[in-house]
């Protein structure tokens, strides 16, 4: 349905040169392949052909536009996801052309909508699965607030590895509702998960002091 990917074509190379890739060192497919191969990743060709190179166990990056993708290992359609979230990427436009990119985005819209809808409906069920895995409510609140700071990342990785159908964003979205207790009345600090706070706050006084420089970064209060 779509044009065959050809990153060797001179026209494509010219177009990519014009947009000045953010990570020029990974402009070639071979370089992107090596980034996966040295970490013993299998079946990586679909990712490297989509312009992506290995960054970390939970993240890959487009060498051209710099967009990062989380929980990528089990993604079946990296090219479509890349085009959907980064429509102005020079690699995607040069590879598929404007018309091909538009067709791909349109065809992916229905799939994406369905996936989000299913995950949204199953959030209560998946919450129970997380509890069954041994994650307490307070612990999950704590991990969410510190998800992007070592050494707590490994717990997010544990969730992903045990429940392959979770996406990183969905896990964060799922866990974030633990700011409000299940009775929807008691509100807890998003860092320690122990101290009760007002509903218009996210952290207790002690955690605000400890995490002052991260306060804006951690200040999210999604409620399901």
Curated annotation (Swiss-Prot):
C4-type ZnF: 189-207
Q: Locate the residues binding Zn(2+).
A: 62, 65, 82, 89
Against CDD domains, the record matches this protein to: BIR (cd00022)
The answer to whether the entry has keyword Cell cycle is no
Entry's SUPFAM superfamilies? Inhibitor of apoptosis (IAP) repeat
InterPro entries of this UniProt entry?
Answer: ASFV_p27_C, BIR_rpt
Subcellular localization, per the record? Host cytoplasm; Virion
What induces this protein's gene, according to its Swiss-Prot or TrEMBL record?
A: Expressed in the late phase of the viral replicative cycle.
Q: Which Pfam families match?
A: ASFV_p27, BIR
GO process annotations (BP):
symbiont-mediated activation of host NF-kappaB cascade; symbiont-mediated suppression of host apoptosis
Q: Does the keyword Zinc-finger apply?
A: yes
BIR repeat residues: 29-92
This protein's major location comes to host cell
Do you know which PROSITE patterns this protein is assigned to?
Answer: BIR_REPEAT_1 (PS01282), BIR_REPEAT_2 (PS50143)
Q: Which GO terms describe its molecular function?
A: zinc ion binding
Keywords from the named record:
Activation of host NF-kappa-B by virus, Host cytoplasm, Host-virus interaction, Inhibition of host caspases by virus, Metal-binding, Modulation of host cell apoptosis by virus, Virion, Zinc, Zinc-finger
Q: Write down the SMART domains for this protein, in alphabetical order.
A: BIR
Give the CC-aspect GO terms: host cell cytoplasm; virion component
Question: Subunit details for this protein?
Answer: Interacts with subunit p17 of host CASP3.
The family note in this entry says: Belongs to the asfivirus IAP family.
Functional note: Prevents apoptosis of host cell by inhibiting caspase-3/CASP3 activation to promote the viral replication. Also induces the activation of host NF-kappaB.
Name of the protein in its database record: Inhibitor of apoptosis protein
